[in-house]
């Protein structure tokens, strides 16, 4: 289980698109450029995010999408360009973050592929790290654990707030990261390849959580290479290539073939020859219904002689 008993169909339907009549731009980046050691990583990039949308970022490795997100969250500072954020009154104001804490205080959070969690500390301690409630100069442990429950319930973490993070599954740790974002009143949450270490069931539960967050008015920026995810949960998609923004499209108006073409800069044609399976091939390794303390879903697979088995 990822974060409790969120209902999950075997086949998820397309998640609701944003209402075009009420869409509002809450984040805008214009002319963003960034170089490292005189090597241009971002070249005059524009980007816009609307309220309560899931905006997908696509591009090959090194295309610049993660660098842009790190600029938006204050990890890096741009060489050129401007960033604007909704001021809560319907206006866009220019912002400049010199560190992630400043972005956090403005409601922008990012969950990286490598979680920023202390394994030997509790869920509650991780959620409020650096912002612990204090009473008479000391940490108020009872209040911290009680406050943590609010955010844990929202992402449906099925564990007590005093549970050590090291005892959680990868999916549950991801939920702790999202709970941290929510505890800072996040209006924008950036997820960097969030399903790379999740099982199929955990992925679908994550999608349910994303839909729930959108209903709360939270916008999601979702970095992914997985086409099936993009068409399942995305509202819009922005494609990067070689440090440039190539295009932004409504998911409903594009195709997988079109996105691949935008990513690689040319038409893509499948040229793989058909693989014929030998029914008598030799099994060299087999696992059946394997369960561990951290991964409750049974795992089964067979590896055959002379074949590459992807996991």
Regions found by a protein language model. Give the residues of each.
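N-terminal amphipathic/hydrophobic targeting modules at extreme N-termini
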Residues: 1-14
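Glycine-rich phosphate-binding loops of nucleotide-dependent enzymes
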Residues: 15-311
């Amino acid at each position: 289980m990822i974060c409790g008993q969120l209902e999950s169909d075997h086949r998820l339907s397309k998640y609701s698109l944003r209402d075009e009549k009420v869409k509002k731009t809450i984040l805008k980046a214009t002319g963003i450029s960034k170089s490292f050691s005189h090597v241009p990583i971002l070249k005059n990039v524009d980007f816009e995010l609307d309220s309560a949308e899931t905006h997908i970022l696509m591009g090959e490795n090194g295309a610049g999408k993660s660098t842009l997100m790190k600029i938006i969250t204050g990890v890096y500072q741009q060489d050129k360009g401007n960033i604007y954020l909704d001021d809560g009154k319907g206006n866009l104001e220019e912002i400049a973050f010199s560190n992630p804490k400043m972005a956090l205080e403005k409601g922008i959070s990012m969950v990286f592929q490598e979680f920023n969690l202390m394994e030997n500390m509790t869920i509650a301690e991780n959620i409020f790290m650096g912002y612990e409630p204090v009473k008479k100069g000391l940490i108020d442990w009872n209040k911290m654990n009680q406050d943590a429950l609010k955010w844990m319930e929202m992402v449906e973490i099925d564990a007590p707030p005093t549970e050590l993070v090291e005892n959680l599954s990868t999916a549950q740790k991801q939920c702790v990261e999202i709970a941290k974002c929510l505890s800072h009143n996040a209006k924008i949450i950036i997820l960097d390849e969030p399903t790379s270490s999740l099982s199929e069931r955990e992925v679908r539960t994550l999608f349910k959580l994303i839909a729930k967050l959108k209903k709360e008015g939270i916008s999601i920026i979702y970095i992914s290479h997985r086409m099936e995810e993009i068409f399942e949960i995305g509202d819009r998609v922005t494609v990067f290539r070689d440090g440039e923004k190539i295009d932004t499209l409504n998911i409903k108006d594009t195709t997988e073939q079109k996105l691949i073409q935008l990513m690689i800069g040319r038409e893509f044609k499948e040229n793989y020859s058909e693989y014929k399976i030998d029914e008598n091939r030799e099994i060299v390794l087999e696992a059946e219904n394997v369960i561990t303390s951290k991964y409750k879903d049974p795992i089964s697979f067979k590896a055959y002689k002379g074949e590459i088995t992807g996991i």
